[in-house]
Design a protein with these regions (language model features):
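Aliphatic-rich helix starts adjacent to a transmembrane/signal segment
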Residues: 1-43
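Flexible, low-complexity segments enriched in proline/glycine/serine and punctuated by aromatic residues
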Residues: 27-158
Length: 158
């Protein structure tokens, strides 16, 4: 009889260990998913900025996200309106895919020998400065409200 009780105790401890491993695996899987989403979102915005060099030159993408602005570009847009549309779409994606997702973008022309004039920018030259993007999110929002935010920082040239 004692052997059965000891066997049940050993078996239950083993099951608890297996359950703990499954919880850790699920948590790690969720963290990997969120980090993949951050990478995709950052690349998406960088590509939007690359497609709208005039908006980048004018500083229309600089700022903090999520952004509450709304711009409908179904009938055509100026570069500034397209940047506002991109900001709104990306803000929506940040809120949808990342818990407590926020970001900031800052593009500078520091160190450039010459910054183009407005007339030259209208000719759509590629952006010559650097942009920095920082995305923050919470990986453990449901488990621990005081968990530190994760961040992804990227220096790029659109």
């Amino acid at each position: 009889m004692i052997e059965v009780l000891v066997a049940m105790l050993v078996f239950s401890v083993g099951l608890l260990g297996a359950a703990g491993l499954m919880v850790v695996a699920a948590r790690s899987n969720q963290a990997a998913y969120l980090r993949t989403q951050v990478t995709f979102l950052a690349q998406s915005m960088a590509e939007r900025m690359q497609a709208n060099a005039i908006g980048v030159w004018n500083g229309d993408y600089n700022g903090h996200y999520p952004d509450a602005g709304v711009q409908d570009c179904s009938g055509g847009c100026t570069p500034s309106q397209l940047a506002q549309h991109d900001r709104q779409r990306w803000s929506s994606q940040l809120k949808t895919f990342l818990p407590q997702g926020e970001a900031s973008i800052a593009c500078t022309t520091d160190g450039l020998p010459q910054v183009p004039s407005r007339e030259q920018i209208a000719l759509r030259p590629p952006y010559g400065g650097n942009c920095s993007m920082v995305v923050t999110w919470s990986e453990r929002r449901l488990v621990d409200a005081d968990a530190p935010l994760q961040s992804f920082a990227w220096e790029f040239q659109p």
